[in-house]
Amino acid sequence: AVAFLRFMRLGDGRLARFNGVSVASPAGLATVLAYDDLFAKPLASARPSGYVNLRRGATTIIADAGVPPPFEFANAAHAGCLSFEMSAGARLLFVNGGAPASSDQDWRPQARGTASHNTMCVNETSSAKLVRHRGLEAMIGGAPIRGPLEVKSTLEEANGDLVWTASHNGYLGRFGLIHHRKMTLSASGAAIRGIDRLTGDETPLRLKSDLPYAIHFHLHPEI
């Protein structure tokens, strides 16, 4: 568990803001990590969780390529599939909205939406559906999300570069679209390249009308 916390830490010492994580004190996290074995090998991957970590030079990128958890654990999950956060040294560059503070819970539905994350949003619609059911919400403490049902993700090394390729079908049922994302972090960590695509499932897709989309990149407030 401690190794996973280290895996999810950005250059400023804080955890990446995915699925209900908010801004926390790096000192508190450092205290927990102090109990880790100093000679333990760091996690190279965290495949069961769906999270991906790209580190080269002073650059760190952490991305979410997992499906939502089961309903009973999804009351704080966000619709941020294929979103990422990025730091250069100790400076945060791109960040997700994260969970709002306890005094700002009215913003929680918006914070959980796809538009609050560094990823593509189609037709101003989140890639996951918020399931509103009074009894279910009372039982698990909030409205869970459902979807995407399938997320594919690979992380490979090519001549020192790290290449992350992923896709999700969160927009397939509503719009017939699959979101593909490819990000390459150079061997030095000084350059990043990215490509986002929308395709049909298997056969060529002809849309009945134009669909707006936006690729969100949320800069950290200090940039």
Feature names for model-found ranges:
Residues 1-95, 99:
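Carbohydrate-active enzyme catalytic cores, enriched for enzymes
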Residues 5, 119, 129, 217-223:
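Solvent-exposed beta-hairpin/edge-strand motifs
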Residues 56-58, 64-67, 86-88, 95-99, ...:
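Active-site proximal loops enriched in glycine and acidic residues that flank catalytic Cys/His/Asp
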Residues 157-222:
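Acidic, contiguous internal or C-terminal segments within carbohydrate-active enzymes
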